[in-house]
Amino acid sequence: MSKQLTAQAPVEPIVLGKMGSSYGIRGWLRVFSSTEDAESIFDYQPWFIQKAGQWQQVQLESWKHHNQDLIIKLKGVDDRDSANLLTNCEIVVDSSQLPALEDGSYYWKDLMGCQVVTTEGYDLGKVVDMMETGSNDVIVIKANLKDAFGIKERLVPFLDGQVIKKVDLATRTIEVDWDPGF
């Protein structure tokens, strides 16, 4: 398979996808992309996987569409048994490969862990997840243990200007115009 590269492990790892089940007998694998455009995952190289706590760099040899799936062939993975060993491995790159964003645009990874407060100063909790819906993204906020409204989790639409009033990544805070009772 591929050689282990400890010196070239990702400094700031970010998961862009996951390897699925093997396809055929020649080492092809299904791949599930988390990028906005599924094929964009192939723009980011090199890929890393983590096996037994060690980073390994894997080289993409080829990829193609098969029905609704994307399938990949990795260098050195030439049979079904080798491919099966990679099933469910996350595809990781160094976040320095991601392009710079315009003002007002954010990578989900940068919003994770941010404290969310209302425009009135009520502390809603911390961002623990993001969801993509048909119309807009939604931030999942884990409420503080002693939340006055007894809410454990809040779903707040990420609508810049309407709901999201200010994002300050330096202080890790997001200000929202949102009723704490929701």
UniProtKB/Swiss-Prot annotation:
Query: Keywords, A to Z?
Result: Chaperone, Cytoplasm, Ribosome biogenesis, rRNA processing
Residue ranges of every copy of the PRC barrel domain listed in the record = 103-182
Q: Give the gene that encodes this protein.
A: rimM
A single GO BP annotation from the record?
A: ribosomal small subunit biogenesis
Describe the function of this protein: An accessory protein needed during the final step in the assembly of 30S ribosomal subunit, possibly for assembly of the head region. Essential for efficient processing of 16S rRNA. May be needed both before and after RbfA during the maturation of 16S rRNA. It has affinity for free ribosomal 30S subunits but not for 70S ribosomes.
Q: Principal localization?
A: cytoplasm
Named from the GO MF annotations, one term is: ribosome binding
Where is it located?
Answer: Cytoplasm
> Does ATP-binding show up as a keyword for this record?
no
Identify the taxonomic lineage of the organism of origin.
Bacteria, Pseudomonadati, Pseudomonadota, Gammaproteobacteria, Enterobacterales
| Assembly, per entry | Binds ribosomal protein uS19.
Q: Which family, according to the similarity comment?
A: Belongs to the RimM family.
One protein family per Pfam: RimM
Q: What is known of its domains?
A: The PRC barrel domain binds ribosomal protein uS19.
Q: Does the keyword Nucleotidyltransferase apply?
A: no
> InterPro entries given for it?
PRC_barrel-like_sf (IPR011033), PRC_RimM (IPR056792), RimM (IPR011961), RimM_N (IPR002676), RimM_N_sf (IPR036976), Transl_B-barrel_sf (IPR009000)
- Write the protein's name: Ribosome maturation factor RimM
Annotated Gene Ontology cellular components are: cytoplasm; ribosome
